[in-house]
Amino acid sequence: MENNYSVTIERKIEKIIYQAALALDKNNWADWFELCDDSFFYSITSFSPEISKDMTYFSGDKKELTGLMEMLPKHNTDHSPLHRHTSVYTVDVSDDGKTAEAVSSVVIYQNMLDGINSHLDSGESRLFVIGKYHDKFLIE
C-alpha cells in the first residue's frame, strides 16, 4: 500500500500535468515554462515501422525551446486554436522520493478558423494529433 506522502506527490504531479495542458491551450508559454525546471529537455518523437526506429522531429533544452516560442509571433502561423485532452495514466515516484516519472495520453483537437477553404472549414473541429507525454519530475 502506498504511503500518504507518495499519494500526495502523485496528485501534485497530476495537477502540474493538467496545468501544463491548460497553459499550452492558451499559448501561454511563460506559464508553461514556469512549470519546467532549468534542466528541462523536450523532444518530439515517433516510431517509424518502415525503418523500425524512433524518429526525432525536435529535441532541445529549455533555453532552445524558449527561443523558438519567442519567435512565434514573427512567423505566419495558423491561428486555429488547439485544445488538449490529457489523461494521466501513471505516476511513479522513486523509492528515495526525489524524482518521479509520469505517462499521460494526449489528444489534441484543432478548431478551424483559417485554411484553404475557410468558408467551408471555419468552425470545424479536427483531430490534430494523438500521442503520449513521458514526463520526468524533480521533487524538492
Spans of features found by a protein language model:
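A beta-strand edge to alpha-helix "cap/lid" segment located at domain peripheries
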Residues: H83, T90-E140
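Short, low-complexity N-terminal intrinsically disordered segments enriched in polar/charged residues
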Residues: M1-D38
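Hydrophobic pocket/interface hotspot
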Residues: A20, W32, L65, A102, ...
